[in-house]
Amino acid sequence: MAVHAPYNHAPPPTQEINGQKPTLAPAITLERPADCINRGQYPAFYIICGYLNRLRADAPHKKYELLTRIFGNWREKVGPDLYPLIRLLLPDKDRERPVYNLKESMLARCYIDILSLEKHSEAAQRLIKWKQPAGNSPNPTGDFAKVCYNEIKARSTVEEGQLSVEAVNMLLDKLAVGKMKQKDYVPILKAINMQCTAEEQEWIIRIILKDLHISIRERGVLSAFHPDAIDLYNVCSDLKRVCWTLYDPGFRLNKNETHLELFHSFLPQLCGRMNDASLENIAKAIGAPKEFIMEEKLDGERIQLHMRGNGAQWFYCSRKAKDYTYLYGAHPGEGSLTRYIATAFQDNVRNVILDGEMMVWDPVVERYLAFGTLKSAALAFSLVKVFDILFLNDHCLSRKRLSERKRLLRSGKIFKNIENYKGRLEFVDEKRGKNAKDIREYLERVVETKGEGLVVKKTDVIYQTNSRGYDWIKVKPEYSDQMGENLEVLVLGGWWGKGGRSGKISRLLCGLREQAFDDGTLQDFLFNRFWNELLGLRVDFVSHLMHLRSMRCSPTHLSQCRNKHKKHWRPFDRSNPPPFMKLGPVGLDDKPDVYIEPENSFVIEVKASEIVPAGYGIGFTLRFPRCKYIYYDKNSRDYALDDECLWTVGQGFFYKTRKLIKRTDFMDLFSRPKRSYDDSQGPGNFRGQKLSDADVETSIFSDMTFSDLEALVHKHGADFTQAQLSDLSAIVISPDQKNPLVRAQIRHGVNVIKPEWVFESIARRTALPFLKEFLVFASEEAQDGRYYNKTLEQYDKVSFVRDRTGGALVDEDGDADVEDEIMDGEDKDEIDVEESRESKNRRMAREDLKEKESNRTLEQKKLQEAWGLRSRASPGDSDSEPEEEMSLKEESDTDSERSRGLRAIYEDEEDGENDSHESDVGVNGDDYRAVPLSGLNDKEEGLMGESPEAMHYDEDRIFYHLAFYIDTAKNAAVNGLESSSPSFDTQERLVKVEKLLIENGGRVARSISDPKLTHIIMDDEDSRRYVELTRKTAMPKRKHIVTPKWVEDCVDEETLLDEDLYKPK
């Protein structure tokens, strides 16, 4: 059993070893087919920029058509070799230009030189400090390429780019020749600056940084290029090979042509992680009571080991195709590993591919070190732990069942006495299981020896390259409430985000106070940091909490919830840190961008896998932290390392001597809330924050309910919820009529009030009536109220000026002594509505596209028209493009190339940065629901929906994790249901809905017995099969039965709405 040292998980070694550093595995020397030669003229680079602008601005379902259009035009006008184009669309997958050694800081210095900027000028500082918010400045921040675009545009005299695609590729090749200094880069970038417009340079910078920000990756691009392209890429990771092998769109590969090959890196199979990670559900998903395999999960780097020539040649690469052969040894007697294991294989093993985990072994204490922590350790104590065999003696084994591959691996036919290679070559510890009890027992055994966790695998499945799913599921201790570490810490600083989080705090620095002196005064704070980006917090709440925009309230009653921390964040001076901070001896990158005084801050409770030694002020840090709760009603003095919260170090872990009180989840702040019902309090996933047992000071809100400002109204007797219940009197929100939740409630006639109403009521110690000025939306009942049309000043005079008997001096219906003052506008400091990140990015991209298109010359417009870029009446407006007409049959055919292409576009998501045996799908804080209205019940419907990796909400594919059955007469006949004769209007509505579902990522099922089925669409005018469908689809989980209106409203609102409001009549 593995014994893990308590070190931080570190990325694979990227430092230079003997003058070398890891790069993408080099492309195998290929010979270009004779008829794969471009004979036409390469297009101007601004044509490609035009396509990139469109890809960034378009919705996902339109990207596929755009890609097929550009590929078709290229083949027609240039030739069959699309490699020069595709390498620009996928710069991070280009093996021939693996690294530029150019990051934002170096590019900023280069452009300061190229643009002749004074180093301390505002323009130069904008380039250097591109992440920092610009305040009221219109200049963008957080997107380095866009910041450069604005500075270049203000100074460039180039009106029309002079470079072709071929010329741009040649210049990029020069930048990627090797590690150079600034003086070497400047002449090349200066040549680009003199021949390219600001727009073209923006895209070249994005290519250099290997992130185009177009929300599409290899799956989408290659699926549009050729139907077999992604299958071939999965087993070779080589764009050139894909382009030169599949240059003919009519050519199709045989199955044996997508097998794994020796010395070709491939994209390995990865683990999925269930959202409801109870051991019972994991066991069920993995096939229990059938036998499954449990392997110990290791803290290393996923590695592919290739050997051929009976041990003469060796090749090592990571799961992201980084070549580490130079480190571990290409031939016997070389490297830190090959020299020790060259004789481990049986004599009859000519060639082999093994899948495993690279570890660092300390033979002195006989334990594993966190991989990549020490360069010398990586050189001296490399160990590969093998868990799979995928190729043997010229035969690919990936299509063999896992149980067969495991049997072969451990049969003694592959290795000689493997026990003799302990510390260099070993099998992964594994055990067979049949139920949740077996998983629990093995997990406890692993945890007792400080192991990482488990990976459970089905035994009867083949090896699927570049896939995640429930065939392999990881089980980590911290996913269980009984395991891991929970603690409450004070937020003390943060780092500015970039990209979609520009202008916002994306990472937090947290800490604890040292033990108090005897006289009760406080010592310095000790600080810990969270490298992760607020895991578990919805992004919209991060915006509310820390962004420089927040809710609006009256000038006289500033609230805790409006601009709560806008004035509290202060720039952090690295040379003169705040006196209350005690930071460790770490590099400048570990100092925050901003800090906040403890008395102005707030407390968060985090859960982490463990607490490990680190170089920070407290001497320790958290591993895999995730935010669970946020508290505003706690004092910073409570978070000290004193006798009441004593920490001791033992075996590399911390153990708290006091028990934490478990609190009700603050689920409205978290991504993917789970449904749990409490008859007395309403749906648990919509309850507000859990407050401490503070005394209730008044009862002025005892009959009201609020969804925001919980801490404030709690003191005055109110309850709060995040769900709309039948007995609610109001919903307290920011004045935002565009919020989908708000619009949904407005449609149901619910009063929507502004936060000001709360503050003014508290100031008067009475609940104000619903005045017009405090209502975002007023129901008919509210509009009929006695005081609805009165101003607050009028109401004050009516209600609060009374004689000794308590009677009003001014008649309640009169206005004799009242000045009739009506508000004629919103407060000047009202904020913009916070948009979803993706929607905002697309909107800004469309605006940017319109601006750029308006500056095109006549010649450019003609050339764009020839390349299919000016087919729209309104360029850049994705809503103005006519929808492609196609039959329902064609649109719903999941086997069609277009359907597969659209699916690939939707599946294009960023992989995690961790090159490990695990997959962190579902952990990242970016996976969030825009509005916690409804969704799959994780506990009840965790196995329903399209696929495990689709269980994460995305606003561009809101139905992607769902599967739908449409209750048409035709489908009813197929499924043996009661027949009907619906009207033409009913049929037309259902056809329209099916098209909407597919365009927005949903899957349409024809059978009611489909195991992934989640929803049934039924029209009000043809609902006779409601009871029959309810009964026949009740097992194993009941399905949502909704009308077509639910689909239409979800698409309009760009989020999933509550199904209960759309049941058929």
UniProtKB/Swiss-Prot annotation:
Family note: Belongs to the ATP-dependent DNA ligase family.
Molecular functions per Gene Ontology: ATP binding; DNA binding; DNA ligase (ATP) activity; metal ion binding
InterPro entries: Adenylation_DNA_ligase_IV, BRCT_dom, BRCT_dom_sf, DNA_ligase_ATP-dep, DNA_ligase_ATP-dep_cent, DNA_ligase_ATP-dep_CS, DNA_ligase_ATP-dep_N, DNA_ligase_N_sf
Binding residues annotated for Mg(2+) 2, in chain numbering: 452
Protein task: DNA ligase involved in DNA non-homologous end joining (NHEJ); required for double-strand break (DSB) repair.
Cofactor(s) needed by this chain: Mg(2+)
Primary enzyme class: ligase
Segments of this protein annotated with the region Disordered: 1-20, 825-928
Keywords of the record: ATP-binding, DNA damage, DNA recombination, DNA repair, Ligase, Magnesium, Metal-binding, Nucleotide-binding, Nucleus, Repeat
Record-level GO BP terms: DNA biosynthetic process; DNA recombination; double-strand break repair via classical nonhomologous end joining; nucleotide-excision repair, DNA gap filling
Name of the protein: DNA ligase 4
Catalysed reactions, as listed in the record: ATP + (deoxyribonucleotide)n-3'-hydroxyl + 5'-phospho-(deoxyribonucleotide)m = (deoxyribonucleotide)n+m + AMP + diphosphate
Positions bound to Mg(2+) 1: 357
Positions annotated as active site in the UniProt record: 297 (n6-amp-lysine intermediate)
Location in or out of the cell: Nucleus
Domain BRCT span(s) in chain numbering: 696-775, 954-1064
Record CDD domains: Adenylation_DNA_ligase_IV (cd07903), BRCT_BRC1_like_rpt1 (cd18435), BRCT_DNA_ligase_IV_rpt1 (cd17722)
GO annotations of cellular component type: DNA ligase IV complex
Positions with a binding annotation for ATP: 295, 297-298, 302, 357, 387, 452, 457, 474, 476
Lineage: Eukaryota, Fungi, Dikarya, Basidiomycota, Agaricomycotina
Biased composition (Basic and acidic residues): 834-864, 886-900
Enzyme Commission numbers on file: 6.5.1.1
